[in-house]
Amino acid sequence: MPPPIAPVSNIVLSVSSLNRQVRDCLESAFPLIWVGGEISNLTYAASGHVYFSLKDSSAQVRCVMWRSRAQLLGWRLENGQQIEARTLVSFYEPRGEFQLNVDAIRRAGQGDLFARF
């Protein structure tokens, strides 16, 4: 992770520049990771992209699964499902929003269930 930028009183960043730096820091700090939680606020967009929040008992994060990845899923997501999502952490610069770009999804515990049989 890059060292934090030391505050300098005479430097003023534009919002775009700040958001770009935040994006670069976040995206370089986190590799492709699995994140588990419950689906909420699920939207299937006309474009084919899937938008939802992934939450646990004390936090939530916005997620997007692009059409090209969503087409490979093979089952329909629903609010309330417990899942594990393989994600890339990203920061959407135009709105200054942290989100997860979802690459793949599996039902939570699916691996354990199949291992028993």
PLM feature segments, named:
Residues M1-F117:
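Acidic, two-metal ion nucleic-acid-processing modules in DNA metabolism proteins
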